[in-house]
Amino acid sequence: EQKEKYRELSQKLSLLTLQFSENCLKETNDYLKVITDSTLLSGLPESAITAAKETAQEKGVEGWAFTLHAPSYVPVMTYADNRDLRKEIYMAYNTQCTHDNEHNNLDVVKELANTRMEVAQLLGYKDYASYMLEDRMAQNSEAVYNLLNQLLDAYTPTAKNEYAEVQALARKEAGSGFELMPWDWSYYSNKLKNEKYQINDEML
């Protein structure tokens, strides 16, 4: 009976995982940001502008079209001078599958978490992480958290220094009251890299 229950739960997990992935893919493929004002393209490398023009032609729209796929998304976040454009694309990318449509993954995630807990309890574990980690190097979730805390302690000073540098550059360019937001990070960190080392991501 336990084996049969485990088989049912495993099959359910597989289907939920597949549904989650398919929803993400569909949401990504459905998104299209169309731009007809060329001034919004300021800062973008020629390769990204050309690709956006080709995407627009493929989709049968005027102007330039951007998607949430990495070759389109990354250049906007890294090079687009227009902050509102960066924010719009960033928010679209990071809120995928949370909207009120057929691709919403919120219920899928809840069902995944509940089913994983069922599997763990069926097999005598306190949670799914303990079940998954038993045969791995970490062995349990406590060991994972200990390692993460060690990494946090080790890298926090460096991260704070890097953030301060990027924030300082942003304020130098955009004004003393400028507050760095997630959609600004790639843009200004790339500028800082270029300023310090005369190199940027496009060159790489």
What residue ranges belong to the model's regions?
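Active-site-proximal, well-structured secondary-structure segments within enzyme catalytic domains
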Residues: 4-7, 11-67, 110, 115, ...
